[in-house]
Design a protein with these regions (language model features):
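Glycine-rich active-site/cofactor-binding loop and its immediate structural neighborhood
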Residues: 9-58
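Rieske [2Fe-2S] iron-sulfur-binding subdomain
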Residues: 1-30, 63-167
Length: 167
């Protein structure tokens, strides 16, 4: 949640197979959407993060507010009667708890009860005090590898004596 301190801040996430756009609206609520324009399917936001008052598709310029509502179209007369209420961004259930943002990436799924779902971990999540943390750096590695092996290398010290004997 540290990435969305102010209204209009947003970030995109593409690692679930669903292009996700997460933003904070003017009412200080976290909102998540499928990051696809309802006109021709282009990505609405192409940057990994930023801040904007509105979200505009770079392809034909359809514009959405921070709640995902369609607010503007270029040359609207060429479209006839378009019901703007039915052409907003597809919203995804999003929750802000314990300094983290939780998003359900499938729009048709039943909304989970986040309090019940996180209850078994609530004490541990609270103790981490993530709300007070600041992101130092973010980067992505796009490698053809088994992520379990890479992660385990940072979690165990058994390999230190042989792999890092001179460091």
């Amino acid at each position: 949640a540290e990435q969305l301190k102010e209204a209009g801040q947003y970030f995109t996430h593409n690692d679930t197979g669903v292009p996700i756009l997460v933003t904070r609206n003017r009412a200080n609520e976290v909102k998540a959407f499928i990051n696809v324009c309802r006109h021709r399917g282009a990505r609405v936001v192409t940057e990994p993060c930023g801040k904007a008052n509105t979200l505009s598709c770079p392809y034909h310029g359809w514009t959405y507010d921070l709640n995902g509502n369609l607010r503007g179209m270029r040359q609207p007369a060429g479209f006839g009667a378009v019901d703007k209420n039915s052409h907003g961004l597809v919203e995804l259930p999003a929750f802000e708890r314990f300094g983290l943002i939780w998003v359900q990436p499938k729009p048709g799924d039943e909304k989970i009860d986040i309090q019940s779902w996180l209850a078994p971990m609530a004490e541990q999540l609270t103790s981490l005090n993530i709300e007070s943390h600041t992101m130092f750096r973010q980067w992505s590695l796009n490698l053809n590898m088994n992520w379990h092996i890479a992660l385990e290398g940072f979690l165990e010290t058994y390999h230190f004596c042989s792999a890092h004997k001179n460091t």
